[in-house]
């Protein structure tokens, strides 16, 4: 049967002024208190994407992983874990290449995932009158991630911008604001990532520096260099602390310091802190007994410090700072520097497991230490959630 195809170009909203860049308009809305919430999105290590919705006072309204997409159809609920699905497909493709078999396509799964994630975020933006904050990751990061099949990062940004460029809520009447005949433009026209800058309408970019490693309660972040170089530099490191003492009542060691004695990076911010060897940290290492594979162990920090001091012949109830600075043996000082690194390591993960948590070495005003495992819904409940939360707060 002969067929004729008649292609007709359609211009949407042809009466509009054609404003491609709406950045100034969005900034004006923000100045006039038109924005009520902020959405932070973290491209996490354990999650494809993690979302944190906060109000303008920094309170968490909602936090959720975007690994799992839940849909309802005819009264039934269907959940799909796209992280596991993509990982499984990657393994199958690797095996197929190795055995010269047909390689399954992964592109459709990625596109399906992106479409659903973009729908969730755009709907939330309109519902909560929110702007979206993303990490400003360099192009090298994106290209590096593309070596992995789960690299949904660059495609996600582009899809979100294009979706928000002409947003229609199909659940609304066509005459309502946001309906078919009154679509919303929430981003500027996408040209390229190089031209994107720090803003595209209601989409903003903030520096990616340490967002997942900032204590969400106290704001503490590790600015130390704890790499062991030699005896002299290790002694100089400990000499910069204001005080190093053992708290017998709490059974932990305290390291009081002023960041100005170590670095200029904390200038114009809070500089006086006290580190406490509270709780445990996870040490990750190559295990010779397991063919040099990655392994991990949980370290009780206070106990480890006590053992080092005991071997060095140091009385923990005495002047610890002077005693440490008087040490001459590499073995003791190197071990102390390694323990300092663990003390400052707020993100703790075990390879090839779901163990991934945040614990702070700094107490808040009530004497409590942030621990993401405590189940406090008012705080981030895992390391990637903490990243999304701090990204939103930076916005």
Predicted regions: what they are:
Residues 1-395:
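Positively charged, helix-rich recognition surfaces that bind polyanionic ligands
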């Amino acid at each position: 049967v002969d067929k004729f195809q008649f292609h007709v170009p359609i211009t949407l909203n042809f009466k509009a002024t054609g404003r491609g860049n709406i950045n100034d308009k969005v900034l004006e809305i923000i100045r006039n208190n038109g924005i009520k919430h902020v959405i932070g999105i973290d491209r996490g290590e354990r999650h494809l994407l993690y979302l944190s919705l906060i109000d303008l006072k920094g309170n968490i309204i909602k936090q959720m992983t975007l690994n799992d997409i839940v849909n309802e159809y005819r009264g039934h609920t269907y959940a799909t874990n796209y992280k596991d699905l993509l990982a499984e497909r990657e393994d199958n493709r690797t095996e197929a290449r190795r055995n010269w078999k047909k390689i399954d396509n992964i592109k459709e799964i990625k596109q399906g995932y992106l479409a659903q994630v973009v729908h969730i975020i755009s709907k939330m933006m309109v519902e909560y009158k929110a702007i979206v904050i993303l990490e400003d990751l360099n192009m090298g990061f994106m290209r590096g991630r593309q070596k992995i099949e789960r690299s949904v990062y660059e495609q996600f940004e582009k899809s979100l911008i294009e979706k928000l460029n002409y947003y229609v809520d199909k659940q609304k009447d066509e005459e309502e604001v946001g309906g078919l005949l009154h679509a919303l433009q929430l981003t500027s026209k996408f040209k390229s990532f190089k031209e994107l800058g720090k803003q595209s309408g209601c989409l903003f970019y903030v520096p990616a520096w340490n967002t997942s490693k900032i204590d969400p309660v106290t704001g503490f972040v590790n600015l130390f260099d704890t790499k062991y170089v030699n005896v002299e530099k290790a002694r100089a490191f400990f000499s910069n602390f204001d005080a190093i003492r053992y708290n017998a009542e709490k059974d932990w060691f305290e390291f009081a310091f002023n960041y100005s004695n170590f670095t200029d990076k904390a200038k114009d911010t809070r500089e006086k802190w006290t580190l406490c060897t509270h709780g445990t940290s996870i040490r990750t290492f190559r295990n010779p007994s397991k063919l040099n594979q990655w392994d991990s162990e949980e370290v009780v920090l206070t106990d480890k410090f006590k053992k080092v001091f005991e071997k060095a012949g140091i009385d923990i109830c005495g002047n610890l700072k002077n005693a440490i600075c008087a040490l001459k043996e590499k073995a003791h000082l190197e071990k102390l520097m390694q323990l300092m690194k663990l003390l400052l390591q707020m993100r703790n993960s075990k390879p090839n497991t779901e163990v991934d948590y945040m614990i702070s070495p700094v107490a808040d005003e009530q004497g409590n230490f942030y621990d993401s495992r405590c189940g406090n819904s008012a705080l981030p409940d895992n390391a990637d959630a903490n990243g999304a939360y701090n990204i939103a707060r930076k916005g």
